[in-house]
Amino acid sequence: MATAKPTFEEQLAQLQQIVNHLEQGNVPLEEALQQFQEGIKLSKELQTKLTNAEKTLGHLIDDNGDEKVYEKQTDDPSNNGGGNRGFGSADEQ
C-alpha cells in the first residue's frame, strides 16, 4: 500500500525544521550533512511544485471562455515596464 505524498505545506514545514536545527550549530557533522542533503532534496521538490503551480495559473480563462496566457513577470532590468505595466496599472483607467 502506497503512502500519501506529503503536501507542499508539510514539506515546507519539514524544510523549515531542518534549517532551524542546522542554524543552532550544535549538530554533529554527519547528521548535518545528512540533513543538508535532505533539505536540498526538499527545496528542489518544493521549487518544482511552485513552478508547476505557476504554469497552471499562467493559463486563465476570461469572461468569454477564451484562454488567456499571462507571461511570468521577472525582475529583468531590460524590461523597464514602459507600456507593459501589468494588471491594475494606472494606464488601465
UniProtKB/Swiss-Prot annotation:
One of its GO terms (cellular component) is cytosol. GO terms for molecular function: exodeoxyribonuclease VII activity. Its EC number is 3.1.11.6. GO terms for biological process: DNA catabolic process. Residues 61-75 have a biased composition (Basic and acidic residues). The keyword Electron transport does not apply. Its main location: cytoplasm. Residues 61-93 are annotated as: Disordered. Keywords: Cytoplasm, Exonuclease, Hydrolase, Nuclease. It catalyses: Exonucleolytic cleavage in either 5'- to 3'- or 3'- to 5'-direction to yield nucleoside 5'-phosphates. It comes from the Bacteria. It is found in: Cytoplasm. It is an enzyme of class 3 (hydrolase). Belongs to the XseB family. Heterooligomer composed of large and small subunits. Bidirectionally degrades single-stranded DNA into large acid-insoluble oligonucleotides, which are then degraded further into small acid-soluble oligonucleotides. This is Exodeoxyribonuclease 7 small subunit.
